[in-house]
A protein has these predicted regions:
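Small-residue-enriched flexible segments
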Residues: 1-338, 343, 348-391
């Protein structure tokens, strides 16, 4: 496998040039923010179009998403567009795309994608979706309905701290509601992952007394927006952006724990979060310091370590970045510092990730996920190809 990174800036364009096909199976990952695309439009440039044209009429999988910041890991954050190109010798690539408009629900969209990707040698699915309008838990459930044993690595696209609109990209055009997936096939593929959080409880456990899907109507019999306003105080004027610094830990009816981040507040005081919260679940708010988050970034990187050449994908979140402030670059450095020097990488702050924890795929919000990939020249044993996750 050959991995290459490229960047596009409003001043200077592509450095190095847009990666082009060479006949091998490939995956092209591209991350950027809305401001970058706006700047490109103002000067008559079309960097996403450049990529699309370069890889048109090939079988490559092109996956793009908007962010709350992006970097290659060896330069400044928010450089523009960041591209990580993976070229394979024996690994196969399959692609599929849909939208909520076409499918009706996120779960149906997940099923539709999975049906398009299904193959006997499918080893992992990469998927990107709107981080505002898509229920990540439902999308993961739909994928699992068809592909219960296939790990999924997913991105919920971001929009900085604005929470207004996001985009995804399949090589054709950037769209608000497209859900795009790539399947990687073949026994030569090796994937390691590390997922860690670093948040600590603040306040007591509380009971979800009314909810439906990813909408929480009542906690302890009261609208949950009031709870966030109490904890945020003067910061409640921008409740969604600042509420991302107070993720909700959810202990569901099966005693599984997950993190959910605030996405929207409705006029009746109910809240929309990044994934499902069951009625009857026990929840509590969490907070963290920059030091906490940096320590767990290093732990995630160590869990994803592999001793052979690989590419790395680092997925953090807008809430973590808001806590870290000017130290956001340090989070990526901490994660990549645990990997072999010079590992080609793409790092992005998003609205959450879909991660397979060994039992199921679900939203891991306000966590950092580090994924390393390589193509082996010999078939791995089961223990060599397993995923690694740290809590």
């Amino acid at each position: 496998m050959i991995a290459e990174t490229s960047t596009w800036r409003a001043v200077g364009g592509w450095v190095p040039a847009v990666p082009e096909p060479d006949g091998r199976a490939a995956v092209v990952l591209v991350a950027g923010d809305r401001d970058t695309l706006a700047a490109a439009t103002e000067q008559g440039a079309d960097p996403l179009g450049d990529l699309g044209r370069a890889w048109a009429d090939t079988d490559a999988g092109v996956l793009g998403w908007s962010t709350a910041g992006q970097t290659t890991g060896d330069g400044p954050t928010d450089v523009g567009l960041v591209v990580l190109t993976l070229r394979f010798d024996t690994v196969g690539v399959r692609t599929a795309s849909t939208s909520i408009t076409e499918s009706g629900t996120a779960r149906r969209a997940g099923r539709r994608l999975a049906e398009g990707l299904a193959a006997p040698d499918l080893r992992v699915v990469l998927v990107v979706a709107d981080g505002l309008g898509v229920n990540g838990s439902s999308l993961a459930s739909g994928l699992a309905d068809v592909l219960p044993d296939v790990p999924v690595i997913g991105v919920l696209a971001g929009d900085g701290h604005r929470y207004a609109s996001t985009w995804t990209f399949d090589g054709g055009r950037a769209a608000a509601d497209a859900i795009v997936a790539v399947g990687l096939c073949g026994d030569a593929l090796e994937l390691h992952q590390g997922v860690s959080a670093g948040w600590h409880p603040v306040g007591p456990e509380r009971l979800v007394t009314s909810s439906h899907g990813n909408v929480v109507h009542e906690i302890d019999g009261a609208p949950p927006a009031a709870l966030y306003r109490d904890y945020l105080g003067a910061l409640a004027d921008d409740i969604v952006a600042n509420g991302s610094m107070l993720p909700l830990e959810v202990r569901d009816l099966d005693e599984r724990r997950s993190l959910r981040s605030l996405r929207d507040v409705r006029p009746d005081g109910s809240i929309v979060v990044s994934g499902d919260v069951a009625q009857g679940a026990v929840v509590r708010l969490l907070r963290a310091s920059a030091a906490d988050l940096l320590l767990d970034a290093e732990l995630a990187g160590k869990a994803a370590w592999m001793d052979r050449p690989a590419a790395a994908l680092v997925l953090s979140t807008a809430g973590r970045r808001r806590v870290l402030g000017e130290r956001a670059d340090d989070e990526v450095a901490a994660a990549l510092g645990a990997l072999p020097p010079g590992t080609p990488s793409l790092a992005a702050w998003t609205y959450g990730a879909l991660v397979h924890d060994g039992q199921r795929t679900d939203v891991h919000d306000e966590s950092i996920c580090v994924v390393t990939l390589c193509e082996r020249t010999t078939t791995p044993t089961p223990t060599e190809s397993e995923e690694h996750t740290t809590a």
